[in-house]
């Protein structure tokens, strides 16, 4: 009875291998797994593919959703021996390629001629010299701009001082002229009270009349006669 369970039914047309158990188990051969991988890739990867779509794309008779569901889960988890083998193979290839690249680089370093090294050194020196010259030019331009700005500020300050000085001189001249006019005007202003009590020189000259000499003598004669009369009466 155990021997009957181990019997295998092979369908060469579809590549499907099933056991003769009451629940036949599918043997995933390399050819069948490759068809499965092609179908999954065609459907957009293991995350997008479903057992139903995989079965439709593969088109293998006798393949059930149960078989595909189990195999898809293992494929997603990365537990298939075929996938592990392919991954290991790709890792080995990458390691080999990496080692080959390292060897090529080492050989290139050791086999580099002194002429190439000297040329690289000359190019580096020329690049450094070029950058130094650019920095010198930039520094010179900055200094020129600073000097020009300083001269501009100095000229603006001088103009401001000249304008202020001219304004002060004009104000002083105007003030002096106004004071002179005020003094001249006040000297010619008449004072009513003074003129009322003190006549002017012209009026004083006209009213002041000196007496004649003859009148003075007559006045003296009258005074002397009066004095004589008084003495006679008293005697």
Swiss-Prot record:
Residues 20-80 form the HTH myb-type domain. Residues 119-139 are annotated as: Coiled coil. Belongs to the MYB-CC family. One of its GO terms (molecular function) is DNA-binding transcription factor activity. NCBIfam families: myb_SHAQKYF (TIGR01557). It is found in: Nucleus. Keywords: Coiled coil, DNA-binding, Nucleus, Transcription, Transcription regulation. Residues 51-76 bind DNA. GO terms for cellular component: nucleus. Its main location: nucleus. Expressed in phloem and/or cambium. Residues 1-12 have a biased composition (Basic and acidic residues). InterPro entries: Homeodomain-like_sf, Myb_CC_LHEQLE, Myb_dom, Myb_dom_plants, PHR1-like, SANT/Myb. It comes from the Eukaryota. This is Myb family transcription factor PHL12. Transmembrane segments: none annotated. Residues 1-20 are annotated as: Disordered.
């Amino acid at each position: 009875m155990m021997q009957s369970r181990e019997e295998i039914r092979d369908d060469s047309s579809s590549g499907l291998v099933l056991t003769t158990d009451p629940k036949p188990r599918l043997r995933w051969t390399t050819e069948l797994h490759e068809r499965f991988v092609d179908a999954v890739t065609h459907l957009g990867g293991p995350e997008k593919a479903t057992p139903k779509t995989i079965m439709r794309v593969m088109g293998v008779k006798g393949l059930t959703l149960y078989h595909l569901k189990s195999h898809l889960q293992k494929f997603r988890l990365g537990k298939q021996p075929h996938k592990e083998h392919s991954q290991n193979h790709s890792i080995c290839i990458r390691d080999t390629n990496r080692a080959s690249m390292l060897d090529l680089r080492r050989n290139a370093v050791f086999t580099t001629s002194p002429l190439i090294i000297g040329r690289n050194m000359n190019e580096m020196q020329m690049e450094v010299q070029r950058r130094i010259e650019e920095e010198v030019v930039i520094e010179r331009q900055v200094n020129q701009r600073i000097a020009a700005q300083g001269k501009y500020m100095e000229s603006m300050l001088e103009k401001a001082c000249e304008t202020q000085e001219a304004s002060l001189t004009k104000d002083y001249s105007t003030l002096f002229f106004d004071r002179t006019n005020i003094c001249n005007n006040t000297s010619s202003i008449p004072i009513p009270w003074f003129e009322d009590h003190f006549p002017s020189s012209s009026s004083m000259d006209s009213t002041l009349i000196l007496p004649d000499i003859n009148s003075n003598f007559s006045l003296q004669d009258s005074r002397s006669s009066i004095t004589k009369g008084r003495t006679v009466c008293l005697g």
